[in-house]
């Protein structure tokens, strides 16, 4: 019996050579004191059960922590784990990212790096609040104020951590190694203190400021959003059908009169009729030509039902390029007629300052509303003629350009709706209506007052809230901003220090987003989040603003810390809001410093993760300085405008360096219907069902081998996951089973060795070296897709070439002198190396195989294989690869001709440059292809007919009329080739002027990659007899397997043929030894007999009639 390994043995050591034998060496005993399975390695693995056993072992053994502890003092590879929300169960998108977060840290650990993997939870913001509202039955923000912020925020806190246990179970079942025990939460006071420190740093640098801007605004959640939140996911913009209106604005005043435009009706188009009550200006383009068009013979649409002459004879102003689009509305029968009716044109710049008749009088009182400069035409370059009328209605509270242009003209920003987007009392006609409800009554008013020229439905892509999914509005709000535009160029420069996968994201989606980055709105009118640490005086006569960046600063000024009900420091509302003090700048002592009510954008929390997770700068300053930037992060492509962007922005602003140096920005996981995975649609396989049926390694392989890590999208299907089982898991396990089966049969415990001189062994070892080099390069480049492809190809080579072609050597076993051990040692060496190379991508199954193969503690505690320890043999690899390619082509020709492989053929002919190099492998080709002879012909085209085709279009310009002579010469065969130069009809042809093609006349011939291959398929009675004999051998092997015999069990064999012709044909097969091939001590052709009998029907093989195989196991005592 082989002695057990000591637990103190270094995990990365390899077993030394052994001469000891035992009856069944494999699986080897493990160092943890557990006995190996009593049964041999199963040929029918249930991978989910194997995985559960491995997970239990890891938990018992503490393998994950050992993988980190073993690398103490080693160089570190820093990984930032983007925190998820735990108020919902993970889906395939999370699993996809989670696998990537495990593959590369595992790989780097095996490469000798120390890789800590600290898990974190994103907890603040709308995701938590919306879930709390749902659970509490809250439908309006006012209900939160009524119940009290402490109770609401506690409910939000409880909801956001609701599924942490389930998340841990999913992550663990993924075989993803993370440190949950030392995880962080963005709601932790230590984390939040680092966040407010960051805000103060930005404020002190002049990069945080308060402003009044038009922002995307969610009326359901009553808070503004940042522009980047609208660009993270494709489904933020959804197709929506709205009513558009084209409205008339009659020109008035002295300038209109001087231009001869008095009473001309300006046409303005809008997709948001609800903004018309706050129309305060119109804008034209300076270089756009505007046309005056009289009402047509059919009458303009705004005059219908109003027959007075003044109305019917009205004139209209719009961009001349768009007149045809309004022909019908203006009363013309065709666009041409409308354009022909234009009476004059005027450039936009000349219209500046012309006043017009406002729609309604809601804000006519200039003393109250400051509208003394309103209702005039302004000029700006943002106006185009792509749609509408070329004249833009301005509501400065509801459009970014509107606000910019109007403020420059001294026109005020007037808010007409409340926080829930309901109209305020000033707009009497629709007061109390929500903006999307107010469209119809407003349009009705416009029609009744003769101001509506056109109403139409308009389908367009419209932004929706990324959390509650309601349509957004744009609305001017008071907000705090990060002045991103001040350091935008620096962000662009630092981006060049980052390696992106896929590479095009650097200067594509991410780079372009950086180049156009705008100031970031970071304040939210909500409750559960990190506070904006700004206190203001409540008396404008004594203004003062204080910004705080630590608990110590708060305690210094307020005399106490913000404490929750448990008496713990807590920066959440309402505890931090309770901190007030007299205004030091108010000599009267009556004003008070109060915190502004807003909280920070949840993305500010996420972007602070690198330093906030360790409470920097209050603790761990040295640690952070040495662990930033990170070596690796990974998330889906949407985070290029989300987490990746905000990490980069805050790191640039605070530390003037990137937050990370390598990043994977993977594609999106789609459901089986091609849509994003959706719980409501149930368009993806249940995760737990896949774990239970196929296992985590199969799912990991499916996701990590797909193009999704290169930025493509991936459709999740059950068949796709199962394909990973077929492609890699089963071939790997089958090779391990094959090795253990024959090693146990011969009682040999293999050793690591690369000394074999056998050509297949040398080839396999050299290919293993190539594999190690290739996978190392791929994983260094964060390309698991290519690495997986290399492993998949190697698995095919291992099982379908090496193992299949080496069966006889393993069957022969190892004798008492050690002869025959080379094959076992080679396959042991390759399996041990392969399981290490595949470990990051198949961590569970490789763990089981490696442990049972080596007796070691864990494959994940070993070092990554060193390719230099394996022999290189480029010439052998090139030659054998060529042999395999020839074999593949020849086998496809067999299949095409309907000739089974067990039927021998007369010969194979191979014509190729360097054919002589294949001579040492003739025996392999004969055996692989079951041919009697292999004919190797030197020269790429020797003995192969070829046809020359002249390209007249390319040759004609060079030789003119002679081209026809050359074409005739090519067709008649009057051409030659010497030293790569083709001559036809006496003319030397240049590359690109001709094509040479091999003429394939034989039905079982093919020309591929410069090699001509032809099979001789003529059959003789002897060849057919040998084919039947090999069919019989296959039938006997099937019978042995059905009888449950071991690979070394000897038998007595009886064959009974219903058709005498089959027996006579079999008698001609003098070259096939059925007895030795089937381990039969005796072979008889007689009546069916034996301990186990199996009948094969006529035509099942090449047999004419039924035949029966009878076998009886011969016990050792009987021999």
UniProtKB/Swiss-Prot annotation:
Name of the protein described by the UniProt record: Isoleucine--tRNA ligase
Top-rank taxon, per record: Bacteria
GO cellular component: a single term: cytoplasm
Motif ('HIGH' region): 84-94
Assembly with partners or alone: Monomer.
GO terms, biological process: isoleucyl-tRNA aminoacylation
Gene: ileS
Keywords, sorted A to Z: Aminoacyl-tRNA synthetase, ATP-binding, Cytoplasm, Ligase, Metal-binding, Nucleotide-binding, Protein biosynthesis, Zinc
Cofactor: Zn(2+)
Major location (coarse): cytoplasm
